[in-house]
């Protein structure tokens, strides 16, 4: 039986094209202004923490690629009913993460890096589970790269610490996340 399918070919082409084009300019077509501002602040905080512009760019670029590929898969109805259930659990976990991140910022002395790291790790695992049959090993390593960076205890401690410029970055990130929560976009 011939397994050629133009739908599958088009989907592969979209995913390949997105992986080659995941720059901030292209992302602006797919990502709203608030999300873009959050990504900018995550980039600045990551660059400050790693002292490595290229590494910070790579982390954010990988994050953008993941989001864009998820969008392509979802828009093209590629998820099975079981995978859609996992994606719904992932969405709820991301919502919990957003609320937790904002609350830790707003209420002094409540931050616990173990909680944030644990929720990020759960998000990563759910995402792997949902896309296991759709993305390449390279895409799965991108997921690990992004989530492992943001779940790192030392990074979280720096981000939520009292020192500048992290305080300013965190404030702006949380303002954006809070706006997305209010608009029910997360």
Swiss-Prot record:
Which InterPro entries does this UniProt record tie to the protein?
TNFAIP8-like, TNFAIP8_sf
- Record keywords: Cytoplasm
What organism does the record attribute this protein to? Gallus gallus (Chicken)
Stored PANTHER family = TUMOR NECROSIS FACTOR ALPHA-INDUCED PROTEIN 8-LIKE PROTEIN 1, TUMOR NECROSIS FACTOR INDUCED PROTEIN
**Subcellular location(s) per record:** Cytoplasm
Where does it mainly reside? cytoplasm
Q: What is this protein called?
A: Tumor necrosis factor alpha-induced protein 8-like protein 1
Q: Name one Pfam family in it.
A: DUF758
Family under the similarity heading? Belongs to the TNFAIP8 family.
One GO term of the cellular component aspect?
A: cytoplasm
């Amino acid at each position: 039986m011939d397994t050629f399918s133009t739908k599958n070919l088009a989907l592969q082409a979209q995913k390949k094209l997105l992986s080659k084009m995941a720059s901030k300019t292209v992302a602006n077509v797919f990502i709203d202004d608030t999300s873009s501002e959050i990504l900018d602040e995550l980039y600045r905080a990551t660059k400050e923490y790693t002292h490595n512009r290229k590494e910070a760019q790579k982390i954010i670029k990988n994050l953008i690629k993941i989001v864009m590929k998820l969008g392509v898969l979802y828009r093209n109805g590629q998820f099975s009913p079981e995978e859609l259930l996992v994606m719904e659990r992932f969405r709820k976990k991301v919502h919990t993460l957003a609320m937790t991140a904002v609350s830790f910022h707003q209420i002094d002395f409540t931050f616990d890096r173990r909680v944030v790291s644990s929720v990020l790790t759960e998000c990563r695992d759910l995402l792997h589970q949902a896309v296991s049959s759709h993305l390449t090993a390279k895409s799965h390593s991108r997921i690990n790269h992004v989530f492992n960076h943001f779940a790192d205890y030392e990074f979280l401690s720096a981000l939520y610490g009292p020192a500048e410029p992290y305080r300013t970055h965190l404030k702006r990130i949380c303002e954006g996340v809070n706006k997305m929560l209010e608009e029910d976009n997360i």
